[in-house]
Amino acid sequence: GFLMLGIFGRKYFKNTSGSIATTLLLVSTALALYTAYGYFFEYGKVDGIYQKLVPLKYTWLQFSEGVSIDMGIILDPISAMMLVVVTFISLMVHIYSLGYMKGDERFPVYYAFLGLFTFSMLGLVVSSNIFQIYIFWELVGVSSFLLIGYYYDKPSAVAACKKAFIVTRFADVGFLIGILILSFHSGTLDFNTLIDTLTSPETAGYKSAAAASFIGVSALTWGLALVFIGGAGKSAMFPLHIWLPDAMEGPTPVSALIHAATMVVAGVFLVARLFPVFAISSPNALTMVGYVGAISALIAALIACTQTDIKRVLAYSTMSQIGFMMFALGVSGYGGEAGLGYTASMFHLFTHAMFKAL
């Protein structure tokens, strides 16, 4: 949809681009619901435990005999849930935008950007390895930049999209360094293998990550902390929250998409994806997640009390709710998908997406 509308939209689909994009997303939503239903009620559970399934995996870049970058799809409880959240909220935004953006000169371009954003988020939530998630992470950043700055003739919108892009890029540098540290010690980019290696004290990867240290902190803790910084930037956690209120300069449906279902919960999703490593191998990093979440929730709530613009109140409300999700992850003892804090965080992510998008 993004490619079709982005390349040919203004020439061939000026009046029908919204209907085409919405129809395509309706199909995507139906497929996401079908996949989630099948996973949760048919084939996902073995002996009472939900499995991490990898239905698709192929080698993308082969550097040498043992060094390659794979691309794949992972299906587990959080990715199945996020498939439904992203497609459903995006579908609602597409439908609402049919009337809201009617008559806009760049109507096809708007839907092309929405399509790119949705594609990027779907790719992010089903990524089977940590480098693949980084690629889609950056695509989410680019598409949010395009959407926030959609009204490019408004100086405030231009300033807001640049601010969001630059602040999240700073955080993403930390994310990339964290990826390099974790993959160097685990010897893999694949999530399942990386988690197994870095949560098993007898493996060579765990021993090297725990032994190597910088200013008294292990390489494993540094790697996880840097990955969390990337997540904190995307999820507007203190002190990287400064871009979020200004992000309301985009069209109102875009604000619903960014502040509800997609971009701001990407950081929570990232911490949840690596949660076993945080909980088992580096409680200190998990404690940092909890503190940052709690501070962000409190500060955002206090700032929201002083705002007079309803859209900025919603922005700080979102920051506060994301803080609660991070806090729940930070205080959760490890129990797999049965950990109470983990479960509460994912449940709140789902419910917040629905009520905030309204």
What are these regions (language model features)?
Residues 138:
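Short phosphate-coordinating micro-motif centered on Lys-Gly-acidic
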